[in-house]
């Protein structure tokens, strides 16, 4: 069984630095992700910026044989969508861009939702709710709280709005490795599960659906 790696204040400072660099990638992409761009161009622009401007490593590239630096998941694709030169963003689409970056030995992992052009009120409401649900989970984090407290906070906010939590995917510990312990579920019971302690670092990245929570997996080229 893998152990949870407790980070020192110095390690957390390095992780904050990696996170700040990743925020710069999204700030750059905010100007780039518009109607008419292909998801492969988003990938290529991000890779050039990470490597050339930030002198960092795209941590996803080569991980699990993944050949790209980010995932682009459009509309009903829950996560892990693959960039393509033929996938052009059109008005009305919602797209999640998920990027990892390593600097100084420590990895940052983040994603952002983009609404392309004019999206429907239903789509906008979904995007807003998943963001709010994520923050409900983040606000539950403190030493002495539990993973169940986080999951419950996310689940309650999403389900009160009529949405369902996707249960096949979860957050995770992060540090020198992209995926560390613990697994962070986005549903749960208050007071249940692992008790949080200072020095733990993990992601909270809920995925919610408008209707059923069910999702299916699709294979593309290679393992992706």
Where are the regions that the model predicts?
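Active-site neighborhoods and metal-handling regions in enzymes and metal-associated proteins
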Residues: 1-224
